[in-house]
Design a protein with these regions (language model features):
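Post-DEXD/H (motif II) to motif III coupling segment of the RecA-like Helicase ATP-binding lobe
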Residues: 432-438, 445-520
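Accessory nucleic-acid engagement/destabilization modules that flank
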Residues: 1-257
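Conserved pre-motif I regulatory segment
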Residues: 258-295
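Conserved Walker A/P-loop ATP-binding site and its immediately adjacent core
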Residues: 321-343, 355-366, 476-480
Length: 887
C-alpha cells in the first residue's frame, strides 16, 4: 500500500488551512523540519542536550532529531486510526468499518516498533554497533518519540490494529526518509552504562521537545494541509522553509543581565537587611546544584534576598530563569504584582523575556491579561510599548498551564511545579520548563505531610538536574528542615545532614552544595523585632464585647474564625446587636464567587491595608483563613480562634503590622503610637489534664477544621507559659514546643495522637507513591499507576458551582464585566454540598443542556445555581453561599 494513501491530519471543521486532509508522510516531515530548526537554534536547549549525549556537530544533531521525529506518528498507519476519517482518495474508502479496542495512536506506534519495525535493521542509522545493540539503543528512543501526547506509550502486546499493508507502508515511509538525513548515526556510548544513564536523565527534556515540535508542526497556519503526492525530498525542502517561519512561534531566549549590586533589582533599597546582606555575600561559585533555606521574620526582606540570590546565580551562568511558587492563588497574584516591577532587571535591556502567572484562575487577573503579547506568523510583532511593563508574557506561553513554566520568569502556585514530579499529563513539559531554572518556594512551613513529601520529590529532582532551589519560610521545625536537606542530598547522591538547631538559632540561613553544608545565624534589625502579648477569651460573648470596646475607641479590629459557618453566624450577630453599623462591618471567607471575592479583597485593603487612614476607624472584619497569607492588612486589634501555633504567628503578623500614629496614619519611622498589640485568642478553658473532647465540646467547628487536637492543646500551653509572641527570639521555641519530636502529649489525646501520627505517615507514604520514578527515563515504567484523579494537595474533593440569574427567561452570569462566567464561579467542599445542595434552585433540563453546550461543560457534572436578589436563594453578595443557614 502506498504511503500516499494514509492521512495524518484532517480539516476538523476548519474553513481554511489547505486541502481536506494532510498526508501522514507530510505531517511527519513537518514535525521533523520543526525539530531540525529547534536544534539549529538551540530552542529550549535541545542542541545542548544532544551534545551532552555525544552528538557534538550541530548539523548532525539537527538531522538526528529530525529523523527520530519522523517516527513520532507511525501509530497512525494503523487501520484502526485510518478508518476514523474517510476520503475517496485514501485506502479505506468503501471498506466496511471494523471494531478495534480503543488504543491511542502513540501506544500503537510503540507497539508497531516492538512487534515489527524493530526487526527491520535497514531502518536503523549507520553505526559501529551490532544490529542487536543498535536495536537496544533504538528501543531507548522509541518511547520518547512515540509518546508525544504528554505520557509515555503503554507497553502492550501486539494487537490486530495494523494490517500487513499498513506495516509495509510504515516501513516504506521510514526507509524513504532515511536518505534525507545522511549524517545520522548511533554513537557507541549510547549502549554503555554511562551513556544509558545520561540518556535516561535527559529523555524527559527531549520528550518535551518532541511535544513542542509536534504541536508546532501540527499548526495549519504554518503547514497547510497537503494531499498532493510528490517525492519526499521535494516536500522535505518545502517543510524546512515553512518550519523556519514556524519556529518564530517560540519566543527567543532572553540574555541575563550582569549583577552589579542590590540596586540592579531594587534601586529603592538604601540599606540591605541582614538577610539581604548575606544573600549578597554568600559564595555561590560552586559546581552543581545548590539548596538555600532562608528562615526569617516578616519584614526581613526574604523575597528580595531570594531574588538577589537568584540574580547572582543567573548572572554566574547557573540558570536562565526562575519560577516562584507560592501556597495559594491569592499569594501568587500578590507576588506577580511585586515581580512586575523587578523582573525586567534580570535581563539585558534588548531582550524580550516573559513573565507568566501560572495558576488555574490567572485569566481573572486583569494585570496578567494586559501583559500578554502575541507572536504572529512572521514572528516580528513586538509588544505594545504602551503596555504597563514594556514587555509582558508571550501569548504562546499564556494559552496553557502546560507551557507556563517554559517562560523565563514564572510566578504561580507551587502546585504547578509539583505537577512536574507526579504522573500528570505533560509533566515532561513542566520539567523542561524547570530545567536551567531556579525554583523559589515561599511559605513552605505551611505544607502538610502530603505536600511536604511532594515538595521533597521536587527538590530532589531539581538537585539531580543540577538546578538551584531557594526555600523561604518564617520558621521550619527541625524535622521539616531535615527532610528538605535529605531530599537535596538524594538528588546530588551525597550524604548531607542538617545540623541540630537550638531555640536561639533564628533567624537562620542554610546553604547546601554537593560537597558541604553551611549553616549560619542572621542578625535581626530592631525594626522587625515584634512583641505581641497574648490574651485569652473563653466565650463568643466575651469576643463580641471586645469588638464593641474596640469600635467605641475608634480602633479597627479583625476576628479570624476557623470555619466559614462560624464567621457567618458571628457576622449576623454583630448586625443584629448594633455594636457596629452595617457599613462598617465586613465578612470575608472562601464561599464567595470570584466576582464578590475580588470586591471584598479591595474593600479589605482599602479599610485595613497599609495606606488606609481615617477610614479605618471603627471598622470590623470577620474573616477566615483567607486573610492569613495573601493580604497586607494592618489591624489595631485582633481576635483569633485557637489554631496551630504557626498559624497564630502568621495571624499575629496582621496585627499592628505597620508603624502608625495614634490616629491610625502611617508613619515612616519611629515608635507605633497605638496601644500595645494584644492577640486575643478564643479557646477552651485551660485544662492541665484534658480529655479527648477538650476542644470539640467548646469549639466544635474548630475541632473539625484542625483535627490534631493535641497540637492545639500544646499551642495553648506554650502561649500561656510565654504570655507573648516575641519575634524573632521565641520563634524556634514556639514551633518546636508544638511540632518537636520529643514533646509530651497528655494521656487524654493518646487516641487522637495515634490517629494523627498514622495519618501523617500514611499521607507521606501515599504521596511517595504518587512521585514519578525517574530512573528508567521517559517510558512506561515511570509510575506504578496513573490515577484518574490526582492532586498536588490531599484535601477533600471540591465541587465547582456557577451562579446564574434568569433575566427575561435567559440564563445570564451572576457577575458582570469581562470573563463573567468565570467570575461567577465558586468552589465548596463536596461534603458541604452533599449536605446543602437541596437548599438551592438549580438549573436543569433543557436550560442546563443549552448552558453546558455554550460553556463547553459536561451536563452530568456541571451545577448552576439560580440566584436572585432575595436572601432565600441561598447566596448573597455580603454573606456568600449560605443555603438555608439560620432559617
Amino acid at each position: 500500500m502506498s504511503i500516499y494513501h494514509y492521512w495524518g491530519k484532517s480539516r476538523r471543521g476548519e474553513t481554511d488551512g489547505g486541502d481536506d486532509y494532510h498526508l501522514l508522510c507530510w505531517h511527519s516531515l513537518d514535525v521533523a523540519a520543526v525539530g531540525y530548526w529547534m536544534v539549529i537554534n538551540n530552542i529550549y536547549f535541545i542542541d545542548h542536550y544532544l551534545k551532552k549525549l555525544g552528538i557534538q556537530d550541530k548539523e548532525q544533531a539537527a538531522q538526528f532529531f529530525a529523523w527520530i521525529l519522523c517516527w513520532h506518528d507511525i501509530g497512525k498507519f494503523a487501520h484502526s486510526f485510518q478508518q476514523l476519517y474517510r476520503h475517496e482518495a485514501l485506502n479505506i474508502f468503501n471498506e466496511p468499518t471494523r471494531h478495534y479496542e480503543k488504543i491511542a495512536h502513540t501506544t500503537l506506534g510503540y507497539m508497531l516498533w516492538n512487534s515489527w519495525l524493530s526487526e527491520c535493521p535497514e531502518l536503523f542509522p549507520p553505526s559501529s554497533l551490532s544490529v542487536r545493540k543498535s536495536k537496544r539503543v533504538m528501543a531507548l528512543w522509541m518511547p520518547v518519540t512515540t509518546g508525544h501526547h504528554g505520557r509515555p506509550p503503554e507497553a502492550i502486546q501486539e494487537l490486530d490494529h495494523f494490517r500487513q499493508q499498513d506495516k509495509d507502508a510504515a516501513r516504506d515511509f521510514l526507509l524513504r526518509i532515511k536518505a534525507l538525513f545522511p549524517l545520522i548515526t548511533l554513537p557507541e556510548a549510547w549502549d554503555e552504562d554511562e551513556g544509558i544513564d545520561q540518556f535516561q536523565q535527559l529523555s524527559w527534556f527531549i520528550s518535551a521537545a518532541v511535544v513542542l515540535a509536534d504541536w508546532t508542526g501540527s499548526a495549519s497556519r504554518y503547514f497547510p494541509r497537503t494531499a498532493e503526492k510528490m517525492p519526499v525530498d521535494t516536500y522535505w525542502q518545502q517543510a524546512l522553509a515553512k518550519a523556519q517561519t514556524a519556529i518564530t512561534l517560540f519566543p527567543s531566549a532572553a540574555n541575563v543581565s550582569a549583577f552589579t549590586g542590590i540596586e540592579t533589582l531594587f534601586p529603592f533599597i538604601q540599606h540591605p537587611t541582614p538577610l539581604q546582606q548575606k544573600a549578597l555575600e554568600l559564595d555561590i561559585n560552586v559546581d552543581g546544584a545548590q539548596l538555600f533555606i532562608l528562615e526569617d521574620v516578616t519584614g526581613a526582606g526574604k523575597t528580595e534576598a531570594a531574588l538577589i540570590l537568584a540574580h547572582r546565580l543567573m548572572a554566574a551562568g547557573k540558570a536562565q530563569g526562575l519560577y516562584f511558587g507560592l501556597p495559594t492563588m491569592a499569594t501568587a497574584n500578590a507576588m506577580f504584582e511585586r515581580m512586575a516591577n523587578t523582573w525586567l532587571a534580570l535581563y539585558q535591556p534588548d531582550s524580550r523575556p516573559s513573565l507568566i502567572l501560572a495558576h488555574s484562575a490567572r485569566r481573572l487577573m486583569d494585570r496578567f491579561n494586559q501583559s500578554i503579547w502575541s507572536v504572529t506568523l512572521s514572528g516580528t510583532e513586538e509588544p505594545d510599548e504602551a503596555q504597563p511593563y514594556s514587555q509582558g508574557c508571550a501569548a504562546w506561553f499564556a494559552d496553557s498551564n502546560k507551557k507556563a513554566l517554559l517562560a523565563e520568569v514564572g510566578v504561580g502556585t507551587l502546585d504547578q511545579a509539583m505537577m512536574a514530579v507526579m504522573p500528570f499529563k505533560h509533566n515532561n513539559l513542566r520539567l523542561l520548563g524547570l530545567s536551567n531554572k531556579i525554583l523559589l518556594a515561599d511559605e513552605i512551613h505551611a505544607c502538610d505531610a502530603w505536600m511536604s513529601r511532594i515538595l521533597e520529590g521536587l527538590i530532589e529532582r531539581q538537585a539531580s538536574n543540577g538546578n538551584a532551589t531557594i526555600l523561604l519560610s518564617a520558621t521550619l521545625s527541625q524535622q521539616q528542615r531535615d527532610k528538605r536537606v535529605a531530599a537535596f542530598s538524594r538528588g546530588v547522591r551525597r550524604s548531607v545532614q542538617a545540623p541540630l538547631l537550638g531555640h536561639d538559632d533564628y533567624p537562620w540561613l542554610t546553604q547546601v552544595t554537593q560537597t558541604e553544608l553551611i549553616s549560619q545565624r542572621v542578625d535581626t534589625r530592631k525594626e522587625v523585632e515584634r512583641c505581641v502579648d497574648i490574651g485569652w477569651l473563653h466565650s463568643e460573648e466575651a469576643c463580641l464585647e471586645r469588638i464593641g470596646e474596640a469600635v467605641e475607641k475608634g480602633n479597627c479590629i479583625a476576628w479570624i474564625r476557623n470555619s466559614v459557618d462560624d464567621a457567618i453566624r458571628i457576622y449576623r450577630q454583630l448586625q443584629l446587636s448594633k455594636v457596629v453599623v452595617t457599613e462598617n462591618l465586613l465578612l470575608f471567607h472562601s464561599r464567595f464567587a470570584f466576582y464578590d471575592r475580588q470586591r471584598i479583597e479591595s474593600q479589605t485593603l482599602n479599610l485595613f491595608g497599609k495606606q488606609s487612614g481615617a477610614q479605618r476607624a471603627g471598622k470590623v472584619i470577620i474573616a477566615t483563613q483567607v486573610i492569613e497569607q495573601s493580604l497586607d492588612i494592618d489591624c489595631d486589634e485582633m481576635i483569633s480562634d485557637l489554631a496551630p501555633v504557626d498559624l497564630l504567628i502568621q495571624r499575629a503578623g496582621r496585627l499592628q503590622r505597620h508603624i502608625r500614629d495614634r490616629n491610625g496614619l502611617v508613619k515612616k519611622s519611629g515608635q507605633d503610637e497605638r496601644e500595645t498589640p494584644v492577640l486575643r485568642i478564643l479557646a477552651p478553658e485551660w485544662d492541665d489534664a484534658p480529655r479527648e473532647n477538650w476542644l470539640s465540646s467548646a469549639m466544635r467547628n474548630s475541632a473539625y477544621v484542625y483535627p490534631d487536637h493535641g497540637r492545639m492543646w500544646l499551642t495553648q500551653r506554650i502561649l500561656r507559659e510565654q504570655g507573648t509572641i516575641r519575634m524573632p527570639q521565641s520563634a524556634r521555641l514556639l514551633i518546636e514546643s508544638v511540632y518537636g519530636e520529643d514533646v509530651n502529649m497528655p494521656v487524654g489525646f493518646a487516641k487522637t495522637e495515634q490517629l494523627q501520627e498514622g495519618k501523617f505517615y500514611c499521607d507521606r507514604a501515599f504521596a511517595g507513591q504518587m512521585l514519578l520514578n525517574f530512573a528508567p527515563g521517559y517510558c512506561a515504567e515511570i509510575s506504578d499507576s496513573l490515577p484518574e484523579k490526582m492532586s498536588t494537595r490531599l484535601a477533600e474533593e471540591s465541587v465547582t458551582l456557577w451562579l446564574a440569574k434568569i433575566v427575561d427567561s435567559v440564563v445570564t452570569p451572576y457577575a458582570s464585566g469581562e470573563h463573567a462566567w468565570e467570575m461567577s464561579v465558586l468552589r465548596v467542599r463536596q461534603s458541604w454540598w452533599n449536605k446543602h445542595k437541596d437548599e438551592f434552585e438549580k438549573l436543569d433540563g433543557e436550560p442546563l443542556r443549552k448552558w453546558c453546550a455554550q460553556q463547553h461543560q459536561d451536563k452530568d457534572f456541571a451545577t448552576v445555581i439560580v440566584v436572585t436578589d432575595f436572601a432565600a436563594c441561598g447566596y448573597s453578595a455580603n454573606e456568600g453561599l449560605i443555603g438555608m443557614m439560620g432559617e
